[in-house]
């Protein structure tokens, strides 16, 4: 798939979901931080009990091979606090883990209502899932931090805060 210009991660994933086929639709970050060896098991769980499975690095069973730099961890902790209290997603302490898997009809329904084009699209999706009463499973992951990440802490954090506040203000339905 190609976009004309950089429209944002949320836009790109929404575009991909729009053309995807199959009984399950998912996405994983392209930077190879998250191990996907559990995918066959997760697909079985989607066929049974769950509508959506989200990777969660905060779960005790998760295996983190490289710890984040302190300033990145502090920023992450502040973000989690805001997600919990500004948008009411306390039951999802790791909204930004780039490992999510949906039943296809659930993905189409959620992404049909999702509007955020940037990185905070995950937050909006989880709000929509929660308000729709979907069955969501948090899944521990095997994850490797990238000390050479292209994320710019100051400008990226400000952009993400703007998107997060817009989501909190708009209250997706």
What feature does the model see in each segment?
Residues 23-33:
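Short beta-strand-to-loop acidic/aromatic patch adjacent to the donor-nucleotide binding site
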Residues 1:
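Acidic donor-binding segment of Leloir-type glycosyltransferases
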């Amino acid at each position: 798939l190609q976009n004309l210009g950089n429209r944002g991660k949320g836009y790109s994933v929404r575009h991909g979901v729009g053309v995807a086929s199959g009984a399950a639709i998912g996405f994983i970050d392209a930077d190879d931080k998250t191990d996907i060896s559990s995918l066959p098991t997760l697909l079985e769980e989607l066929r049974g009990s769950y509508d959506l499975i989200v990777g969660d690095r905060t779960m005790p069973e998760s295996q983190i091979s490289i710890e984040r730099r302190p300033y990145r961890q502090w920023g992450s902790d502040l973000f989690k606090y805001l997600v919990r209290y500004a948008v009411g997603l306390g039951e999802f302490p790791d909204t930004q883990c780039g490992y999510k898997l949906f039943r296809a009809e659930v993905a189409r329904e959620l992404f049909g209502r999702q509007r955020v084009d940037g990185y905070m699209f995950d937050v909006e999706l989880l709000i929509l899932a929660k308000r729709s009463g979907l069955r969501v499973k948090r899944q521990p992951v095997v994850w490797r931090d990238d000390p050479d990440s292209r994320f710019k802490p100051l400008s990226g954090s400000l952009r993400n805060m703007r998107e997060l506040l817009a989501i909190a203000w708009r209250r997706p339905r």
